[in-house]
């Protein structure tokens, strides 16, 4: 089974991808993991990605597509895989379709996790992280024992610039602009299923398995 996970920032795609990977016994492939893997291995792609990111640029479709092609050539994807963070655009989706066709494969389902904007803002803007050890908390869902301070090393917690409400709303707007055409692409092909992204991770997993007939 080949699954594509879509959803706004804070929708819990990564959590669901990990849970589904365990449930279905297929690898979870994320763009972030691929970037880190190539950088760690010192590949040519990894060097290109590092140079672009050091310069504050965006990784091009060509580089991202090349990473996906390399990853899908590995034997562990034979029973299927879960893509998280790719494709992000219709151009990438068309490339992926062509790549899968060349491998004699096709997408099983594109799952779109639907979460209201205000809930996304609440989820993300409530995050706090420790600048010393990297631990992440949430002011209401996973608060530290002492408000504002890390449980591990007592460092004062900080809110990332990206996690401030105004910036979360900006990211949501960008997500809508880029992803609505992608959702339409998969909907027109009869491959899109929307899943309510509100609830516990286990509850959302149960809803996901239901739409997959599992």
Curated annotation (Swiss-Prot):
Recorded catalytic activity of this chain's protein: AMP + ATP = 2 ADP
Region described as LID: spans on this chain: 126-163
Location, primary (coarse class): cytoplasm
Keyword Cell membrane assigned: no
Ligand binding (AMP): 31, 36, 57-59, 85-88, 92, 160, 171
Positions of ATP binding: 10-15, 127, 136-137, 199
GO MF assignments: adenylate kinase activity; ATP binding; zinc ion binding
Binding positions for Zn(2+) per the UniProt entry: 130, 133, 150, 153
CDD domains, A to Z: ADK
PROSITE patterns the UniProt entry points to: ADENYLATE_KINASE
GO biological process, one term: AMP salvage
Chain intervals for the UniProt region annotation (NMP): 30-59
Subcellular locations according to the entry: Cytoplasm
Superkingdom, natural source: Bacteria
A single GO cellular-component term on record: cytoplasm
UniProt free text on domains: Consists of three domains, a large central CORE domain and two small peripheral domains, NMPbind and LID, which undergo movements during catalysis. The LID domain closes over the site of phosphoryl transfer upon ATP binding. Assembling and dissambling the active center during each catalytic cycle provides an effective means to prevent ATP hydrolysis. Some bacteria have evolved a zinc-coordinating structure that stabilizes the LID domain.
Oligomer status and interactors: Monomer.
Protein name, per record: Adenylate kinase
